[in-house]
Every structure is written in C-alpha cells, then in structure tokens.
C-alpha cells in the first residue's frame, strides 16, 4: 500500500520540476525525528495537510519500521507520502503516484456499480424458468388426466375402471363374452381365466366356481388385480 498526499494541486507539478534528484536528504541529516513524522503520517495526517513539517524547502526521505516516508517542499507548496517501496525512489515518481493510485479507484467504482444495473435482468431470468415450469407442470397434469380418462373406462354393466390394454385383452380372449369357455384349455369368462388363476384373485365367495358364474364387475375387478400384480404376461398372447 502506497499513500501519497498532495497538499496543493500545484504540488505535483512542483514535485516533477522542483524536487529533482540531487536535493534528497535522509531525515537524520536534517535533524528530523523519524518516529514523530511516521506517527503523524499514520495517525494524524490532518496536521501534515495543514502545514509543512518545517520552514523552507526540504526533501526528506527515510524508512521507519519497514515503511518508506517522504516529505517534500519548495518553500511554498509541500507533499508527503508513505508506504512500502524503495527509499531511493526519485521524487518525480513519488509526485506522479497520486495519478496511478486514483485511476484504479475509478475503475473499481465503475465495476462496483455495474452489477446494480444488471440486477433487474437477473431477476427476470430467474423468474422466467419458474413461469415455464408452472406451465409445463400444468400441461403435464392435463395430459396425464386426459390419458387416464381415455385409458381407464368402466366396462358396460360394470363400475370397475379397466385400462385400454386390459380391454383389448378381453376382446381378443372372449370378445367380451362373460360366459365364454375354451373347451381345450378350460379357460373361462370374459378374460379366459384358468381356474387356479381365478381362485388366486377372485373374492372368496367366487373361489372354486367357474369365472362364468361371476358378474362382470367381479370378473373386471379380478382381471385388474391380476394385471396390476402380475402384469399382462398372465395372458400368453398379451
């Protein structure tokens, strides 16, 4: 960190021309109290801004506690600075230092203000996916409801909702005939249940009797139960 204070707007120009190399002197050569000047620069800079450290022209440079200090005057205008660096740095470089220090500060201010200008678009970008997500969710929900309505319908004479795949199986197996019986396999009913399969899914009061003796709602419920637990593979040609 390098801190430079110019006590007058003309001091920079004077620092370039008036404090040329060759006039520099160490503090000890001029009988200056290094500790006192260092403390003033660190804790009481107002006093250094208000008045020069001594009368007349001077060019004082010294290092105290690993920090470089520089105090200069042409007898009318004065400057002072401190920071890490070379104690032998030409006075011309010290005088130009305020311009180098101030320029990054202007850049930092511009960089700091920029995010505030971008804040509004960021909010819009954040909200937009939420709106799209809501629309997609609603659309998906509507499609799901529509699919369920078209694929799960109650059979005629039955209040049980049977999905479209199971309805197709019933049409293929028996043509929807509740009393259909396959003489070769013994499969019976709307869904052509084998007796052992029927007994595993039918209500207790219909177990042990032919599926053809059960009403359509009971046959539908048994078929849905078998389809949901064992899958369509229970019907060989499903």
Curated annotation (Swiss-Prot):
Which intervals of the chain are annotated as region Disordered?
A: 87-161
- Localization (cell): Secreted
Q: Which domain of life is it from?
A: Bacteria
* Compositional bias annotation for Polar residues: 87-97
Q: Which InterPro entries match?
A: Lysozyme-like_dom_sf, RPF
Task: Tell me which CDD domains the record gives.
Answer: RPF (cd13925)
Q: What is its EC number?
A: 3.2.-.-
The UniProt GO MF terms for this protein read: hydrolase activity, acting on glycosyl bonds
Region forming the signal peptide: 1-27
Q: What's in the keyword line of the UniProt record?
A: Glycosidase, Hydrolase, Secreted, Signal
Which Pfam families is this protein grouped with?
Transglycosylas
**One Gene Ontology CC term in the entry:** extracellular region
Q: What does this protein do?
A: Is able to cleave peptidoglycan and affects clumping and separation of bacterial cells.
What is the designated name of this protein?
Answer: Probable transglycosylase SceD 1
Q: Which organism is it from?
A: Staphylococcus saprophyticus subsp. saprophyticus (strain ATCC 15305 / DSM 20229 / NCIMB 8711 / NCTC 7292 / S-41)
**Gene transcribed to yield this protein:** sceD1
């Amino acid at each position: 960190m390098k801190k430079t204070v110019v006590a007058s707007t003309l001091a920079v120009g004077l620092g370039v021309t008036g404090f040329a190399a060759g006039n520099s002197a160490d503090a000890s050569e001029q009988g200056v109290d290094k500790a006192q000047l260092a403390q003033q620069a660190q804790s009481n800079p107002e006093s250094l801004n208000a008045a020069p450290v001594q009368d007349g022209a001077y060019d004082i440079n010294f290092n105290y506690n690993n920090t470089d200090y520089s105090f200069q005057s042409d007898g009318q205008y004065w400057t002072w600075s401190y920071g890490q660096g070379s104690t032998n740095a030409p006075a011309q470089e010290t005088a130009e230092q305020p311009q180098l220090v101030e320029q990054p500060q202007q850049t930092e201010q511009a960089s700091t203000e920029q995010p505030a200008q971008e804040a509004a678009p960021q909010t819009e970008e954040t909200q937009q996916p939420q709106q799209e997500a809501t629309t997609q969710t609603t659309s998906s929900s509507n499609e799901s409801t529509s699919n369920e309505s078209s694929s799960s319908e109650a059979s005629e004479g039955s209040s049980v909702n049977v999905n479209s795949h199971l309805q197709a199986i019933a049409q293929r197996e028996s043509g929807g005939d509740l009393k259909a019986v396959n003489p070769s396999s013994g499969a019976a009913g709307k869904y052509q249940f084998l007796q052992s399969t029927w007994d595993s899914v039918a209500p207790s009061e219909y177990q042990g009797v032919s599926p053809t003796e059960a009403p359509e709602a009971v046959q539908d419920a048994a078929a849905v139960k078998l389809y949901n637990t064992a899958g369509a593979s229970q019907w060989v040609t499903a």
